[in-house]
Amino acid sequence: MTNADGLAPHSMNQVAAAGARSASPSVQVIESHAASDYLGNLQRCAAGRPDLTIAVSADMSTAVWRTAQLHQNLRYALLDATPVDDNGQPTELSNVADLLFKEQEPGYLVGVMAGLIEKQKVGAATHNTLGILAMNHGPGLDAYIAGYVAGARSVAPDVRFKVTYSDSQDPAFCKQLGITQISGGADILFEVTGHCASGYIDAAYDASAYAIGSDVDEAYLSPAVITSAIKRYDRAVALTVQQVGAGSFSAGRRVFALRDDAIAFSTPSSIVPQDIINQVLEKQAAIRSGVITPPATIPPGI
């Protein structure tokens, strides 16, 4: 079941639906058109007694919490979130699988790329400064930033950061935040912002700077995007559907990582030299093997 963002190309919903369909020919996708649809759509799903109901994104955390308690003999999966009760508290349920990700891993990889671009002064990267815009504080967002900072510093220890947090999802407002960071020297803007990503990335494009996306491949938004830190929603959903088909559904937290092929960085743009890509791939192999463990906690001073 999608959130209200619909099945637009490149969206979280579209990627998740593709993963489900790749794992089972009998998948039915139900689109939600507004947040007010969530609870009713989940109840209608329950009436059909499906083997598994997958809800996409944290937007449905409370609706899943309510519905799963009413239908404890049915199985649910909540993508990229944990059920949240009516008091706003995360809650584990015995019939809900929380499909989560190690955001610090893709954050680290794109951080390495950004750090090397600054170190080598590739193209417009001349100020040794990276910009970050986050929607707000939270475990996933903090992990993205922590990994990004660690990755960049692993190859460019003296690189500087400009970090801004915004509760606003207005693209125009986030564009202004990007303009401010660029005015302060930021060459590459890394967004973990949600719906206002397009505005922040536009700021990079207008200034002939660079941008890095998150969650899905955001190259479609602008030529300024040089890569994206990707959570492979399709892979996580496909593995969960396969697990149900094999009769081995497991409730609770499932954290997907590089070892599951559920983390990636998108194909870099032509601005990124091959030697930098090769170094990022080496870091990726080191994370997969356990030689490198990217941190999930933002360091002091960031």
Name each model feature, range by range.
Residues M1-I302:
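A residue-level marker of the well-folded mature domains of exported/periplasmic proteins
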